[in-house]
UniProtKB/Swiss-Prot annotation:
Leader sequence segment: 1-30
Covalent S-S links between cysteines: none
Pfam families: DUF1283
Name used for this protein in its record: UPF0482 protein ETA_17520
Length: 115
């Protein structure tokens, strides 16, 4: 009779161990519908910060380019205005201001004149 109980115990032991493992793994599953961030520092926030920095840098470079272009166009218009003023006040009677090319030209030759 003891041998029968021993055989039964030996046969059920692996089943009990498997059941215990299944129960342990089943209860070990974590609830994944919540995100916990410790100290506000995660890969997602670092990535967002990097993307925002790249966007700010690109915007800053673009603004710099636009400002340089506006300044260049202003300087060009300012020089043209000064050149027109100098050409019209020139003592050279053959000098005239060409508004299309923004240059002071000689009436006889059509070449640029330095007023």
């Amino acid at each position: 009779m003891k041998t029968m109980q021993q055989r039964l115990a030996q046969a059920t032991l692996p089943l009990v161990v498997l059941a215990a493992l299944f129960t342990a793994t089943h209860s070990a599953h974590a609830q994944t519908d919540r995100l916990i961030i410790e100290n506000g520092d995660s890969a997602l926030t670092k990535e967002q910060a990097r993307e925002q920095k790249e966007q700010w840098d690109a915007t800053h470079r673009l603004r710099g380019k636009v400002n340089n272009r506006v300044e260049k166009e202003f300087d060009k218009a300012d020089r043209a205005y000064d050149n027109q003023d100098n050409c019209e006040q020139s003592l050279n009677v053959n000098a005239y201001w060409e508004p299309n090319t923004l240059r002071c030209l000689d009436r006889r030759t059509g070449r640029p004149v330095t007023p």
